[in-house]
Amino acid sequence: MKKLLFSLLSAAALVPMASCGGKAEASTTTAVEEPTDSIPTVYYIKDITSENLVKVYEALGRKAEGNNVGVKISTGESMKSHHLDTGLIKDFVHLVNGKFIECNTAYNGNRSQTEQHYKTAQEHGYTAIAPVDIMDADGDTTIVVNGGTHLAYDIVGKHFLDYDFLVVLSHFKGHAMGGFGGALKNISIGIASADGKSWIHTAGKTRNPAELWQNLPEQDAFIESMAEAAKAVVDHVGGKAVYINVANNLSVDCDCDGNPAPPKMADLGILASLDPVALDKACVDMVFNFPDSTKTNLIERINSRHGTHILDYAEKIGVGSQKYNLVTIE
């Protein structure tokens, strides 16, 4: 049974736009009786199970089709990382006949080289349930960024062009540099090759990972570059994509961290949409409106990195909408 919970009618209606490091303020919601067709829908289910992952995907009404369906996940840096559990996602990946897709990292670690990256994916159980494609194993290619300020193009794994349909299956959590990571980060940094990751992190200054840390821009330029890379991917795939966020193990740290901080707040659930901006916005709203103080660390991480700026900028350049109808599935 589906029941409409609420519609977010403005970008500020639910999430307080606190200054960096600021505290969350009281928020309000506006109830509606029926969803508005022009506003994207975000589907939500609280219990995080393999059956419910399938259920929330089916609610989207868009079937993953084609000979090559890519399921974009993060394979996780180490066994301590909070990457998505294979028991949770196995049935869903089989349902869509998907192949896990990833790209190498731009920093030293277990996933900076293809051979070690495959080994890490194997250790984390992913190769046992579906093929894994490290998309920049054979190099990279570019896709255009329309209307960008920092990037004229995005640098993605060469194999990305082989896929007919994109399933963006993200673990929503905090992030050391972006404040939070969800669908937008997964399609920007996540689909970028190692060189592409350097390109985004430096706001177009260098594609050489060896030069990344010496060329970091001011924070908003990095955040905006992530949004621009996400736009390139969204424009490329068009309507052949779905976006799902699993909001569990809500650490302040990303799955790219080999020794992440333990989660403080409780799991939120599974959310899905055809709009990645609306999806990430709904997840952020749930964090800011969580009913107890266990949310504080994650909110401080988001605010201290000006993390919500990616939502504002992504909406501005046409990636998606921060307005959404939230529908719960029971």
Regions found by a protein language model. Give the residues of each.
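Repetitive helical segments and hydrophobic/amphipathic motifs
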Residues: 11-12
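N-terminal, intrinsically disordered, polar/charged segments of Gram-positive cell-envelope systems
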Residues: 26-33
